[in-house]
UniProtKB/Swiss-Prot annotation:
GO biological process: translation
UniProt name for this protein: Large ribosomal subunit protein bL19
Keyword Ribosomal protein assigned: yes
Gene: rplS
Membership in a protein family: Belongs to the bacterial ribosomal protein bL19 family.
Keyword hit for Secreted: no
Function per UniProt: This protein is located at the 30S-50S ribosomal subunit interface and may play a role in the structure and function of the aminoacyl-tRNA binding site.
Record Gene3D superfamilies: 2.30.30.790
Amino acid sequence: MNAQEIIRSLEAEQLKSNLPEIHVGDTVKVGVIIQEGNKERTQPYEGIVIAKRNSGINATITVRRIFQGVGVERVFLLHSPRVESIKIIKRGKVRRAKLYYLRDRVGKATRVKQRFDREL
């Protein structure tokens, strides 16, 4: 067993199996565990998935939302122990793999059409 096989087997143990099928354009609510003082709590972060990277344990999604008139993007490691839950709010109908063009849009132009042919 060489080093790469050992690393792959260790990573396979850490993969989460209960993740929903997330697509670019979906509106998701991510529950992130944050620590305040000596207490831990779950902070929800809701927004639209503008990018997705699939690479095993390093799979990430970039979620964008508008907070107090300012666009905020966060990158979440899907298999991180800090990500407690991911819930799909609605499915989006898009024709691009990356929605970086939404960064330049303002107001109603940032909306994505809803898709009804996929399960939530």
